[in-house]
Amino acid sequence: MPLLRKYEIMILLTEEFNDSELKTWVFNYAKNLRKFSVCDISVISRGKHNLAYPIETKMKGNYIQLNFSSMPKYITNFSKTLKMDSNVLRFLVFNKQL
């Protein structure tokens, strides 16, 4: 059985999303994660907040938290997908297992 590790990704999206568009974006990204045999996906919307400093001239952003289990070799693929998305201002991947 392959070694699964628990990860958390915090994603900062542009503020242009309304609630339904945000849900659609998250659903599509979660569907993309499932292609890599990701399991135990949970999504938490942290809401829209003011940024401490402008990022690409944006002053607000939507925060999304994704928790899931995956094989370590796929994390690079997830990161590349997020880097190519123009709606993503920043993201950070945490390994939740010590």
From Swiss-Prot:
One of its GO terms (cellular component) is chloroplast. The keyword Plastid applies. It comes from the Eukaryota. It is found in: Plastid, Chloroplast. Pfam families: Ribosomal_S6. One of its GO terms (biological process) is translation. Keywords: Chloroplast, Plastid, Ribonucleoprotein, Ribosomal protein, RNA-binding, rRNA-binding. Its main location: plastid. One of its GO terms (molecular function) is structural constituent of ribosome. The keyword DNA damage does not apply. HAMAP family: Ribosomal_bS6 (MF_00360). Binds together with bS18 to 16S ribosomal RNA. This is Small ribosomal subunit protein bS6c. It comes from Phaeodactylum tricornutum (strain CCAP 1055/1). The lineage of its organism: Eukaryota, Sar, Stramenopiles, Ochrophyta, Bacillariophyta.
